């Protein structure tokens, strides 16, 4: 008990006596101090006293698929900073291979009486994945916001980059450079954002049969290298990728096949992750408006937490084409 009092007091910036008064439900403690102590208790993983468990903490979960892709730490920075400014403590939950699953994180967050959860890049974006844990949040009436496209039946508010506009920008750029054989490296078959990108590409390019121009991959550099290599071998000179990580894999594939980027093959990414100006060549990509989207996600969540209604719909944000050194006129132009 003494260790717990000491740790909670240090985390909350108050005395151990104040922590004791809060935990025992005594008077003489301001609401702000009481909230700080309970939040510290939640963050440190201690259970609340039984009489306090019915109240939700000012703790918000941010569940990410990974931290290796630079776009997710960038989003986390925006979301956690915005939450802190609104008086909430963020709990960052990042999945790892063989580690804690998204379902497990949901259970942990529910046990800690969180006020709400923001998901980015979770299994909600995969049509063939399990979604039971999301429905548990709905059953509990817990505020939830999703970042980027997900399956429609979940019905949570979403903030998304407009995938159709992103593809139109990338395709238009490559066409303006004279490329005619333009392919795509996308995520898995059931990945909703990739599906949207493919639909937009089919419309823009007038595809009836896309099998020769589309390859799918896990969101890894090695997976993209294999997928993009098949496109290059089929004579594709421009490749649009569903993420910057996939684009880096595509550049590696072209080089292994003796092609020069961008002289022989042009590559366009998606995200504009950190350090894309430092790649060789610097990556042409479509920038997601992460700061605006992160702020909007927090606004939607806090509005729900405060008891106001929000439209359980999707807010679409327009991306921006950023032209760098990985695209050039088609060979022979």
Where are these regions (language model features)?
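N-terminal helix-turn-helix DNA-binding module of bacterial transcription factors
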Residues: 1-58, 331-333
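Short, flexible, glycine-rich and Lys/Arg-enriched loop motifs at helix boundaries
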Residues: 49-57, 121-133
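Bacterial carbohydrate/catabolite-sensing allosteric modules
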Residues: 43, 81-86, 113, 135-333
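Short gly/ser/thr-rich secondary-structure transition/capping motifs
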Residues: 42-47, 100, 126-128, 251
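Central regulatory/effector-binding core of bacterial HTH transcription factors
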Residues: 81-127
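Short histidine/acidic/glycine/proline-rich micro-motifs that form metal-
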Residues: 66-68, 96-97, 122-126, 188-192
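N-terminal helix-turn-helix/winged-helix DNA-binding helices
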Residues: 41-77, 86, 96-97, 108-111
